[in-house]
Amino acid sequence: MLQPKRTKYRKVQKGRVKGLAHRGSSLAFGTFGIKALEAIWLTARQIEAARIAMTRAMKRQGQVWIRVFPDKPITKKPAEVRMGKGKGSPEYWAAVVKPGKILFEIEGVDINLAREATRLAIHKLPIKAKFVVHKDYINA
């Protein structure tokens, strides 16, 4: 699963996801992709589940790029612990995703196979997302 090798700080503030994604909102590597339509904290497990679903559907053909990285540590307090007494310990890692962000890109497969692979991957994600095609793609 994806997580940073090392970080400057062990815990980060919660923050808010506001506005649309301007950086990373267009296809840069592949011909097809998955674009997020909602804001969310995408966990490393969710990213990995979507990646596995996509690569299995493509039968190891083509190439997949993951365009989001889980670099935000999400903390959690143990069960049955009273409020207060400081922040909990880091539990898992998440990527902050804004609407319009490209999550995955695919190259080297047929458009029908890419559409099916992304459909399966989107089902693994807890948000609305859509299949996108590069503007220079010619359907041969």
Swiss-Prot record:
Subunit structure: Part of the 50S ribosomal subunit.
Function: Binds 23S rRNA and is also seen to make contacts with the A and possibly P site tRNAs.
Signal peptide annotation: none
Protein's name in the database: Large ribosomal subunit protein uL16
Keywords, in A-Z order: Ribonucleoprotein, Ribosomal protein, RNA-binding, rRNA-binding, tRNA-binding
Top-level lineage group: Bacteria
Gene Ontology biological process terms from the UniProt entry: translation
Similarity section: Belongs to the universal ribosomal protein uL16 family.
